[in-house]
UniProtKB/Swiss-Prot annotation:
Gene3D superfamilies: Ribosome maturation factor RimP, C-terminal domain, RimP-like superfamily, N-terminal
Source organism of the structure: Stenotrophomonas maltophilia (strain R551-3)
Gene Ontology annotations for the cellular component aspect, listed alphabetically: cytosol
Biological role: Required for maturation of 30S ribosomal subunits.
Taxonomic lineage from the root: Bacteria, Pseudomonadati, Pseudomonadota, Gammaproteobacteria, Lysobacterales
Protein name per UniProt: Ribosome maturation factor RimP
Region of interest called Disordered, as start-end residue ranges on this chain: 163-196
Pfam families for the chain: DUF150_C (PF17384), RimP_N (PF02576)
Length: 196
């Protein structure tokens, strides 16, 4: 998260917690016509999977946070507030969240290049809280990334395990029949009689 997003997350987290929910993270996206402030919320880990985020939860958080933002006013100018569930391709904002998803695959964008790359995709292998680092397995090799160097990270859902993968046809593709032609020579086709 950016410094601005971190400050806003720290400001709003107690409000979200008071509603019995968890603030996973904040995205602050400035733009010339007005910024977008996106909050990702979820139910506390202890209540999952029996309870999931629903539209009513998002609306409650939106109302409470809007009122708080009007009073605290941490963003100058116009902005749009969006409150969202994390979805199956959930964003990851901190070491604790990476730790919850050990063994799963993630897409990561780095702030600064590491080994000549800013993007990586790999399995989350280990978390080192003392060093503030995450170990990924990328192309069968270990890659250790400082959490401070992560700009964005998202889980890459296993669509097959979720039962949502598109089905692949088995065997060879069926052959399409060739269009039939009435004449095998260069003679023009007979004209159809007109009904009069």
């Amino acid at each position: 998260m950016s410094d601005k997003a971190t400050d806003i997350a720290n400001l709003l987290a107690p409000t979200v917690v008071s509603l019995g929910l968890e603030l996973l993270g904040v995205e602050y996206l400035p733009a010339p016509g007005g910024a977008t402030l996106r909050l990702y919320i979820d139910v506390p880990l202890a209540e999952q999977p029996e309870r999931i985020i629903n539209v009513d939860d998002c609306e409650r958080v939106s109302r409470e946070v809007s009122a708080q933002m009007d009073v605290e006013d941490p963003i100058s100018g116009n902005y749009t507030l969006e409150v969202s569930s994390p979805g199956v391709d959930r964003p990851l904002f901190n070491l604790e969240q990476f730790g919850r998803h050990l063994g799963e695959s993630a897409k990561v964008t780095l702030k600064l290049p590491q080994d000549n790359r800013r993007r990586l995709q790999g399995r989350i292998e280990a978390i080192d809280e003392a060093a503030g680092a995450i170990t990924f397995i990328v192309d069968k090799a270990e890659v250790v990334v400082s959490a401070d160097n992560i700009d964005k990270a998202r889980i890459m859902p296993d669509w097959v395990a979720l039962g949502l993968a598109p089905s692949k046809p088995t065997g060879p593709a069926p052959k399409r029949p060739k269009p039939k032609t009435n004449s095998s020579s260069n003679e023009p086709a007979a004209k159809k009689p007109r009904a009069e």
